[in-house]
Amino acid sequence: YVKETGVDCLAVAVGTSHGVYKGTPYLDFDLLKTLANEVSIPLVLHGGSGTGDENLTKAVRYGIQKINLNTDLNKAGQSALKEALNTLEKSEGKKLNLQQTIAFGIEGWKEELVHYMKLFGSAGRW
């Protein structure tokens, strides 16, 4: 498939899917290792959110070079936003404007992203 299509990267089906999981998914690391040994292009893991840090770091060790984590990032941003709104409204009794509100969500999103960058060893790299 890789030779026929000339793709730049390959999203592999090794046990993850998009969206929210009930429980932690089972990743087929034997299949992932085989695929990584067979192709010379970067492997992609779709649906990395909810997979767990241990599974994700192992997936990187076994050849995954790009991981989609949108659900985890969005959940972190939403959680930070909700916490900030509850705390500020209770302690100061005031409402925030939209720009202030969005900033809290972005900060939560960034904190989660930094967590993953450190987890995968990509923090501080260019």
Name every feature range the model reports, one short phrase each:
Residues 15-17, 48, 72-74:
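Short, ordered loop/turn segments at secondary-structure junctions
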Residues 18, 42, 64, 92-99:
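A near-ubiquitous, low-amplitude feature marking generic local secondary-structure context
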Residues 21-24, 45-48, 70, 105:
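Glycine- and other small-residue-rich loops at beta-strand/loop junctions that grip anionic moieties
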Residues 28, 74, 78, 98, ...:
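Generic structural signal for well-ordered, non-membrane alpha-helical segments
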Residues 37-46:
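Short beta-strand/loop segments at the ligand-binding rim of alpha/beta enzyme cores
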Residues 73-94:
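Short glycine/proline-rich, acidic loop/turn segments that cap or connect secondary-structure elements
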Residues 90-103, 122-126:
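Flexible, glycine/charged-enriched surface loops at secondary-structure junctions
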